[in-house]
Amino acid sequence: MKLSIIIIATSLVIAVVASPSKDSKAIENDKTEQRMEIVVQETARACSKQIGDKCKRNCECCGKTVVCGTIYVGGKEVNQCMDKTSDNAILNRLGKGMNFIENTFSFCV
């Protein structure tokens, strides 16, 4: 009898300690809301630059497979419109396909 009371009491204590309180759950939801944010990377703009011109966004570059890519000149980062991704013809064709998909989801005007 005493053993069963001890087991029941221990089970209740474990259940109370293990269950999260309402306050901690509310705080956790608040933290989740703070972490959720929408980041818009591209703004709707018409293209105005050709391959080789300096750019800041994909929307500035004209062409279905042209994206604003990063190259390094003299150790400095330069962004320019480009469509070539590799010297290998097969990899370059795959890269152009990826550029096309990236431009599709950029929502440029």
From Swiss-Prot:
GO terms for cellular component: extracellular region. Keywords: Disulfide bond, Ion channel impairing toxin, Knottin, Secreted, Signal, Toxin. Disulfide bonds join C47-C62, C55-C68, C59-C108, C61-C81. The keyword Signal applies. Residues 1-18 form the signal peptide. GO terms for molecular function: ion channel regulator activity; toxin activity. Expressed by the venom gland. Residues 19-46 form a propeptide. It is found in: Secreted. Putative ion channel inhibitor. The presence of a 'disulfide through disulfide knot' structurally defines this protein as a knottin. Belongs to the neurotoxin 25 family. F7 subfamily. This is Hainantoxin-XVIII-6. It comes from Cyriopagopus hainanus (Chinese bird spider).
